[in-house]
Amino acid sequence: MQILLANPRGFCAGVDRAISIVERAIEMYGAPIYVRHEVVHNRYVVDSLRERGAIFIEDIAEVPDGSILIFSAHGVSQAVRAEARARELTMLFDATCPLVTKVHMEVARASRKGKEAILIGHAGHPEVEGTMGQYNNPKGGMYLVESPDDVWKLNVKDENNLCFMTQTTLSVDDTSAVIDALHRRFPKIIGPRKDDICYATTNRQEAVRNLANDADVVLVVGSKNSSNSNRLAELAQRMGKPAYLIDSAADIQESWLQNAKCIGVTAGASAPDILVQQVIARLQALGAVGSVELRGREESIVFEVPKELRVEVKQVD
C-alpha cells in the first residue's frame, strides 16, 4: 500500500497570516486575547491557540473593556466592526483574509453605486455573513444563492442593474454552474474581473483531481466546519473514489483501507502539516510503504501581518 500526497495542500497565505496575528498578539500583549469566532476552521489550531491564551467568542459583548480583540480570517459585517470600534478596547486587529476583504470591497462598491448584488455562497457560513453585511443601501438589494435552482427562483428589483460575487471557498465546478445560470437568467449581470474563489481553494481542488485519478481512497485532513476541506472530499467522491474528511489520524478506520493499493492524502487550507505527518505515520503503521508527493502548482503568496505585530516571536511546535 502506497501513500500519495496532494500538492499543494494545507495552509494557505490567509490562514497563515490569521494564525500569526493571534500568536504574535499573545506574545506581545500576553493572555488573554479575544478572538471573534474561530480564527480558522480547524480544531487542532483552535485548541492550540486556546491553550496559549486565546479566548474565542461569538458576541463582542463577551469581551471585557480594555481587552484586545481579533476578527477571524472569515471577516465580519460592517455592523460588527462598528460595534467593536465603539467599545473601549486596548487594540483591535483584523485577521480577515485579504482575498475575503477584496470581496467585501466589491459588495461595498455595489452598495455605494446602488447596484443590486448577488452572492454565491453557503448560508450560515461566517464568511457569507460578513460579506452580506457589507451591503447597506436600502434602495438596492443583496441576495444569497447556493444553486442554479436558487437563481431561477430569485426576484430582484432591476434585472439591468445587477452584479455578483462569490464566497472564496466554494467548489469551482458548482460555482461555475451557478454563474452560468446567473448569466442565462440575467443577461446584463456583471461579475468580477476574476473569479472570487481564492487561489488556494482552486489549487487544492485541482490537486485533488490529480490525486483521485491514481488513489483508491482519499483522506482529507480538515475539520467538519471547514468549507474548503468539505469541498475537497466532495470532489474526490464525485470522481468515484471513497473519500473521508478527518480531523486527525485517530479518525482513520482500517476498514476504509481494505483492498486499497494507493491511499491519497490531502489537507484543507486551514489544516496544519503536523496533522498530515501524523496521518502518514498512522498509515505506515497500518502497512503503507513510503509516500510520494505529486507534482503541483507552486504557491509563493505571503500576506503581511499588521505593522504593530511585525516582530520576531518564539517558534511554537
Curated annotation (Swiss-Prot):
Entry keywords, A to Z: 4Fe-4S, Iron, Iron-sulfur, Isoprene biosynthesis, Metal-binding, Oxidoreductase
Cofactor note: Binds 1 [4Fe-4S] cluster per subunit.
Positions annotated as active site in the UniProt record: 127 (proton donor)
UniProt keyword annotation of ATP-binding present: no
Family: Belongs to the IspH family.
Pfam families assigned to the protein according to its UniProt record, in alphabetical order: LYTB
E.C. number: 1.17.7.4
Pathway info: Isoprenoid biosynthesis; dimethylallyl diphosphate biosynthesis; dimethylallyl diphosphate from (2E)-4-hydroxy-3-methylbutenyl diphosphate: step 1/1; Isoprenoid biosynthesis; isopentenyl diphosphate biosynthesis via DXP pathway; isopentenyl diphosphate from 1-deoxy-D-xylulose 5-phosphate: step 6/6
Cofactor(s) listed: [4Fe-4S] cluster
Residues reported to bind isopentenyl diphosphate: 41, 74, 125, 226-228, 270
A GO MF label: metal ion binding
Chain residues that bind [4Fe-4S] cluster: 12, 97, 198
Organism of derivation: Yersinia enterocolitica serotype O:8 / biotype 1B (strain NCTC 13174 / 8081)
Annotated binding of dimethylallyl diphosphate, by residue: 41, 74, 125, 226-228, 270
Record text on subunit structure and interactions: Homodimer.
GO BP, one annotated term: terpenoid biosynthetic process
Function: Catalyzes the conversion of 1-hydroxy-2-methyl-2-(E)-butenyl 4-diphosphate (HMBPP) into a mixture of isopentenyl diphosphate (IPP) and dimethylallyl diphosphate (DMAPP). Acts in the terminal step of the DOXP/MEP pathway for isoprenoid precursor biosynthesis.
Name of the protein described by the UniProt record: 4-hydroxy-3-methylbut-2-enyl diphosphate reductase
Keyword match 4Fe-4S: yes
Residues involved in (2E)-4-hydroxy-3-methylbut-2-enyl diphosphate binding: 41, 74, 125, 168, 226-228, 270
Coiled-coil boundaries: none
NCBIfam families with a match to the protein in the record: ispH_lytB, PRK01045.1-2, PRK01045.1-4
Catalytic activity: isopentenyl diphosphate + 2 oxidized [2Fe-2S]-[ferredoxin] + H2O = (2E)-4-hydroxy-3-methylbut-2-enyl diphosphate + 2 reduced [2Fe-2S]-[ferredoxin] + 2 H(+); dimethylallyl diphosphate + 2 oxidized [2Fe-2S]-[ferredoxin] + H2O = (2E)-4-hydroxy-3-methylbut-2-enyl diphosphate + 2 reduced [2Fe-2S]-[ferredoxin] + 2 H(+)
HAMAP family: IspH
